[in-house]
Amino acid sequence: MERWTLLDILAFLLLLSLLLPSLLIMFIPSMYKQHASLWKARSLAKTLSMASSARLTPLSSSRTPCVLKQDSKKL
């Protein structure tokens, strides 16, 4: 087997330095999948919180409490 010369080692290191960023680009997104799902969960919780805090007032003075409109002051 042939020994590597200094020129061979430098060429190998140059090739490695050119390939390393592309390897990182391939593997980094899979590391952040958990963070993305956590962000979606927080966004959903915020949306549900905003929806539950909306004030509802009766549409008319009728006795049916199920007919409601959204209070325009909150928006």
From Swiss-Prot:
Q: According to its UniProt entry, what is the function of this protein?
A: E protein is responsible for host cell lysis.
Alphabetically ordered keywords of this record? Cytolysis, Host cell lysis by virus, Viral release from host cell
Q: What is this protein called?
A: Lysis protein
A GO biological process this protein is involved in?
A: killing of cells of another organism
Species of the source: Escherichia phage alpha3 (Bacteriophage alpha-3)
What residue intervals traverse the membrane? none
Give the InterPro entries listed for this entry: Micrvir_lysisE
Q: One Pfam family of this protein, by short name?
A: Microvir_lysis
Q: Which gene encodes it?
A: E
What taxonomic classification does the UniProt entry list for its organism?
Viruses, Monodnaviria, Sangervirae, Phixviricota, Malgrandaviricetes
Q: Does the keyword Cell inner membrane apply?
A: no
